[in-house]
Swiss-Prot record:
Belongs to the lambda phage ral family. One of its GO terms (biological process) is symbiont-mediated suppression of host innate immune response. Keywords: Host-virus interaction, Inhibition of host innate immune response by virus, Restriction-modification system evasion by virus, Viral immunoevasion. The keyword Methyltransferase does not apply. Pfam families: Ral. Ral interferes with the cleavage of DNA by E.coli EcoK restriction-modification system, by modifying the activity of the host methylase. This modulation allows incoming, unmodified phages to escape the host's restriction system. The keyword Hydrolase does not apply. InterPro entries: Antirestriction_protein_Ral. This is Restriction inhibitor protein ral.
């Protein structure tokens, strides 16, 4: 059985968020169009890359939120 994943169709179901400025980073590179076999397992490099990108941005948001919370504690 062959499965084809159209990343353009997949991404198209989500609203594009331009707030994080990562839209160009989320684009699928030609070498990432299909999962590849590595060490006997299928690996989706696009999914790994975009998950890391999202985690990085969420970490930045959490750091900023923590910084703002620490500032508001001193204001009280």
């Amino acid at each position: 059985m062959t499965t084809t994943i159209d990343k353009n169709q997949w991404c198209g179901q989500f609203k594009r968020c331009n707030g994080c400025k990562l839209q160009s980073e989320c684009m699928v590179k030609p070498e990432e169009m299909f999962p590849v076999m590595e060490d006997g397992k299928y690996v989706d490099k696009w999914a790994i890359r975009t998950t890391a990108m999202i985690a990085r941005e969420l970490g930045k948001q959490l750091d900023e939120d923590a910084r703002l919370c620490s500032l508001s504690v001193f204001d009280a």
